[in-house]
Amino acid sequence: ATFSZAPPGBZKAGQKIFKLKCAQCHTVEKGAGHKQGPNLNGLFGRQSGTAAGYSYSAANKNMAVVWZZBTLYDYLLNPKKYIPGTKMVFPGLKKPQDRADLIAYLKESTA
């Protein structure tokens, strides 16, 4: 299923998911540093592997995907399948609602 078929995302629910599953490795605020994973500020419309100052895997750089709702929706289902060789150890979010919620939160928090 694609993002266009996903349920509407809930930003508040997405924030909870981010805190539980993503914040250990990622920040969203402008100017916040990289952690184990890159800072996600300005994520939408950015090509994978291009946040300045973060050491990406070759796989992430070479994938050259542009992050939008639809690409994030597919990626977050199974990151290792979407970008084989990625350093991201997160197994993914299987539930469409969880992915839609997280994307709604990221859309606001990284802008």
Swiss-Prot record:
Name this polypeptide is given: Cytochrome c
Residues modified as Hydroxyproline: 79
GO molecular function terms attached to this record: electron transfer activity; heme binding; metal ion binding
Gene Ontology annotations for the cellular component aspect, listed alphabetically: mitochondrial intermembrane space
InterPro entries: Cyt_c-like_dom, Cyt_c-like_dom_sf, Cyt_c_1A/1B
Further comment found in the protein's record: There are amides at two of the three positions 5, 10, and 11 and at one of the three positions 68, 69, and 70.
Family listed: Belongs to the cytochrome c family.
